[in-house]
Amino acid sequence: MSLPIVIIGSGFASYQLIKTIRRTNNDCPIHVFTNDSGDDYNKPDLSHVFSKQQSPEEVVTLSGGDFAEQYNVILHRHTWVESIDTEIQAITANGEQYAYGKLVLATGSQTFIPPFHGDGCGDILTLNSLKEFAGIQQKVLESKKVLVVGGGLIGTELAMDLANAGKMVTLVEPNTHLLANMVPDFISLPLEKACKEKGITVNLSDCVQAVNKQEQGYRVTTSNGHSYYVDCVISAAGLKPNTKLATEANLMVNRGIVVDLNLQTSANNIYALGDCAEIEGKVMAYLQPILLSANALAKTLLGTDTALSMPNMMVKVKTPNYPIQLAGNTSTDIERWSVDIDTQGLCAKAYNINNQLTGFVVTNERVKNAFPLFRELNTTN
């Protein structure tokens, strides 16, 4: 019997890879090691669990056991992988050694918590997995006032979801506008307005400095001298790839686990996929690049080396009070913008120095134009 494909991690990337492999091969042995229950769920659903009043159980689409049975995998639940031996091609988990033919690191990421001062820092919450949701759900439900650190994609979505769930929300972002790494300020200003209309306090160009415990809740102070008294603090200040195992195995690690276009790491027969992988200098924690990566890697693992091809990709900002869709380059090296604004929303097209369309953003009712624009973008690039 051939040595198995061993996958470390049971998140979206891992399970998408397994589903893709099983479309063409139901026989090759696959072992999955995960430190949680291994339940299958749609991670983007975490963006609206509070407004929909969902429980962790309701987010699950397939239990770990049912997933393992349906996709013919051996699932090692609640199991910690301690080390990787690249020489003998084996991992050690819970003190036992397991050999692999191919190893896939799908270890995901963790939410970055900035180094704040104060005795309340250990109580800061994060929401980057089903397991974390289960751990913070009750605390958030009991909270009336919530402060969210970070006004990027995840932070803005979370703040709006909490506001729609009836919470008093404060959003603190060090940049001058929301979604600063994705769009220019003229696009995010209407989003900021929509947040404020929902009762969210949006505090820009400011940073949380300290989180201190009070008799009830926490006092959060910022660099601009603001003080907020809240029941809980949630960090959405970006993601940090989980690279500890890879680093200890002497794999090449930069921001993430460095891989080539075949998603192979610096070691033979070891690959990385998803939020933990760094591809051409970028960590792309979005669904579409993970889907494309899983499709390419499945073919490679089954014997046909397949390089990842990254076309333009669409990103949806799940803010129901002001929906946004964008694709292509919308943040750097843009020569000019062509912007059309009306009562239905905004349509902004980005052009380079050669007057070629390089990206676009549509908002509100104008999101219906996203796919025609996406086709145009792919035609010109």
Swiss-Prot record:
* Principal EC category: oxidoreductase
Named cofactor requirement(s): FAD
Tell whether Transcription regulation is among the UniProt keywords: no
Molecular function (Gene Ontology), one example: oxidoreductase activity, acting on iron-sulfur proteins as donors, NAD or NADP as acceptor
Q: Where in the cell is it found?
A: Cytoplasm
- Record's Gene Ontology CC terms? cytoplasm
Q: Report the record's disulfide bonds.
A: none
Q: Which reaction does it catalyse?
A: 2 reduced [nitric oxide reductase rubredoxin domain] + NAD(+) + H(+) = 2 oxidized [nitric oxide reductase rubredoxin domain] + NADH
* Major location category of this protein: cytoplasm
E.C. no: 1.18.1.-
The record's keywords, sorted A to Z, are: Cytoplasm, FAD, Flavoprotein, NAD, Oxidoreductase
- Membrane-spanning parts: none
Pathway participation? Nitrogen metabolism; nitric oxide reduction
PANTHER family registered for this protein in UniProt: NITRITE REDUCTASE [NAD(P)H], PYRIDINE NUCLEOTIDE-DISULFIDE OXIDOREDUCTASE DOMAIN-CONTAINING
Q: What does this protein do?
A: One of at least two accessory proteins for anaerobic nitric oxide (NO) reductase. Reduces the rubredoxin moiety of NO reductase.
HAMAP family to which the protein is assigned, alphabetical: NorW
Family, per the entry?
Belongs to the FAD-dependent oxidoreductase family.
- What's the protein called, per UniProt? Nitric oxide reductase FlRd-NAD(+) reductase
Q: What is the lineage of its organism?
A: Bacteria, Pseudomonadati, Pseudomonadota, Gammaproteobacteria, Vibrionales
